[in-house]
């Protein structure tokens, strides 16, 4: 009888742990429209659409660029506007702009940067509330003109 009782307790404990772990998942409210960005040298800028998927609340979206080491930069690429309000279920747009220093990037290979978006939730009216600002980080590739028209028939040859 005690083995049956232990087995039932173990099953109930396992179920409780699984249910609590499932409730800990987080989903960003402000999301970019793609998973990576390619900035061609021939482009002056590229636009990224940010979507607020929250059905009720507006969010602030803070955007910036980092280099391959994770350092925040403002040149040779920058984001405009760096902060914007996006109402619920609406889109916002940011522009990744090339600066004059962009000519100093290598012309024989792509350069890696990271595009970041942090969602900032509105202040809660309730006392003792924990609010979390989630951040999305996606790769941003700067592609020089020498690689823009490379055929993707045999990409391993380049």
Where is each model-derived feature located?
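Bacterial N-terminal signal peptides that target proteins for export
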Residues: 1-14
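N-terminal signal peptide c-region/cleavage motif recognized by signal peptidases
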Residues: 20-25
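Beta-sheet-dominated interaction scaffolds and their linkers
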Residues: 27-51, 149-158
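Extracytoplasmic
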Residues: 43-45, 58, 91, 110-112, ...
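Buried hydrophobic-core signal for structured, non-transmembrane domains
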Residues: 46-52, 96, 113-118
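Short acidic, flexible loop segments centered on an aromatic residue
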Residues: 55-71
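Intrinsically disordered, low-complexity Pro/Gly/Ser/Thr-rich segments with frequent PxxP/GP/PP motifs
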Residues: 71-103
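Terminal connector regions
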Residues: 101-147, 151
């Amino acid at each position: 009888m005690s083995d049956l009782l232990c087995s039932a307790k173990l099953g109930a404990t396992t179920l409780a742990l699984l249910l609590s772990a499932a409730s800990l998942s987080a989903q960003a409210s402000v999301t970019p429209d793609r998973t990576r960005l390619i900035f061609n040298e021939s482009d002056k800028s590229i636009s990224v659409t940010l979507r607020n998927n929250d059905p009720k609340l507006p969010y602030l979206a803070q955007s910036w660029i980092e280099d391959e080491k994770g350092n925040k930069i403002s040149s040779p690429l920058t984001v405009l506007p760096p902060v914007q309000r996006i109402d619920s279920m609406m889109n916002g747009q940011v522009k990744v702009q090339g600066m004059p220093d962009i000519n100093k990037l290598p012309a024989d290979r792509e350069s890696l940067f990271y595009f970041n978006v942090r969602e900032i939730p509105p202040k809660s009216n309730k006392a003792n509330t924990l609010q979390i600002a989630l951040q999305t980080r996606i790769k941003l590739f700067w592609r020089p003109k020498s690689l823009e028209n490379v055929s993707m028939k045999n990409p391993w040859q380049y």
